[in-house]
């Protein structure tokens, strides 16, 4: 594996049964992403973007091939160990923010840190720093329903990186936002990736944002190809 490679997929297969027929989504897919790199995943709906993110994020088991995270093979690991890797090394951002409505922005960002064993004080300090970095420190006490769409997504991004993961997987993170807000949220995301050295794989239909990333890949006949 090349130096600084965070995620490496080698010959990954993923199939689903559909009405007695085997549907092949990923067919010998190869892909790698390195520290500090932002890669756009641009492909039509139904071609396997979410499947790829789920396999890369250890949410689904591949039917063949290898998934390596930071040089460690994840095939054959128990569900407990896969969960431990997800919690410590992988952050997820989705099109819908999935923030807990009864908690403030600050508390939402603290939550994964508290689960990881940090003290309330440590988690609060880290959450506050992330809110400041995302330029919404003044909104920390507000609940998700009191935030704008762009603010909600910035909180979701901050929560995703709260435990300092090495890999960020995002599925249409700006899909529900207007173009101006989407660009602003991506600016914040890009700055965070560059500053922290994260590797980020971002699925998007927004070609303008995709062109701003380091590389663009798509899924063609079950394989991952640059374009």
UniProtKB/Swiss-Prot annotation:
Quote the InterPro entries the UniProt record gives.
Answer: AAA+_ATPase, ABC_transporter-like_ATP-bd, ABC_transporter-like_CS, ABC_transpr_LolD-like, MacB-like_ATP-bd, P-loop_NTPase
Q: Name one GO biological process term.
A: lipoprotein localization to outer membrane
Which membrane topology describes this protein?
Answer: Peripheral membrane protein
Annotated Pfam families? ABC_tran (PF00005)
Reading the lineage from the top rank, the first entry is Bacteria
Query: Is the keyword Metal-binding assigned to this protein?
Result: no
Q: Name one GO cellular component term.
A: plasma membrane
- Per its UniProt record, what SMART domains does this chain match? AAA
Q: Per the UniProt record, which EC number(s) apply here?
A: 7.6.2.-
Q: Which UniProt keywords apply?
A: ATP-binding, Cell inner membrane, Cell membrane, Membrane, Nucleotide-binding, Translocase, Transport
Q: Where does ATP bind?
A: 43-50
Q: ABC transporter domain spans which residues?
A: 7-227
List the GO molecular function terms: ATP binding; ATP hydrolysis activity; transmembrane transporter activity
Q: Where in the cell is it found?
A: Cell inner membrane
Instruction: Check the record and name the PANTHER family matching this protein.
Output: IMPORT ATP-BINDING PROTEIN, LIPOPROTEIN-RELEASING SYSTEM ATP-BINDING PROTEIN LOLD
The role this protein plays is: Part of the ABC transporter complex LolCDE involved in the translocation of mature outer membrane-directed lipoproteins, from the inner membrane to the periplasmic chaperone, LolA. Responsible for the formation of the LolA-lipoprotein complex in an ATP-dependent manner.
Entry similarity comment: Belongs to the ABC transporter superfamily. Lipoprotein translocase (TC 3.A.1.125) family.
On assembly, the entry states: The complex is composed of two ATP-binding proteins (LolD) and two transmembrane proteins (LolC and LolE).
Q: What is this protein called?
A: Lipoprotein-releasing system ATP-binding protein LolD
């Amino acid at each position: 594996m090349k130096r600084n490679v965070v995620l490496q997929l080698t010959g990954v297969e993923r199939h689903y049964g559909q009405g007695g027929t085997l549907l092949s989504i990923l067919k010998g897919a190869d892909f790698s992403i390195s520290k500090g790199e932002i890669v756009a995943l641009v492909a039509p709906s139904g071609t396997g973007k979410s499947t790829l993110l789920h396999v890369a994020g250890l949410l689904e088991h591949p039917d063949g091939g290898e998934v390596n995270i930071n040089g460690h093979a994840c095939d054959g690991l128990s569900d407990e160990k896969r969960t431990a890797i997800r919690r410590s090394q992988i952050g997820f951002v989705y099109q819908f923010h999935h923030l807990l409505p009864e908690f403030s922005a600050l508390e939402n960002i603290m939550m994964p840190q508290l689960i990881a064993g940090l003290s309330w004080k440590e988690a609060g300090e880290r959450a506050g720093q992330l809110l400041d970095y995302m330029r919404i420190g003044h909104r920390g006490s507000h609940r998700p329903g009191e935030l704008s769409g762009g603010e909600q997504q910035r909180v979701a991004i901050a929560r995703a990186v709260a435990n300092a993961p090495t890999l960020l997987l995002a599925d249409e993170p700006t899909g529900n936002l207007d173009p101006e807000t989407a660009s602003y949220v991506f600016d914040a995301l890009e700055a965070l990736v560059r500053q922290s050295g994260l590797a980020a794989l971002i699925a998007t239909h927004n070609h303008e944002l995709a062109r701003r990333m380091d590389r663009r890949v798509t899924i063609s006949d079950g394989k991952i190809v640059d374009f």
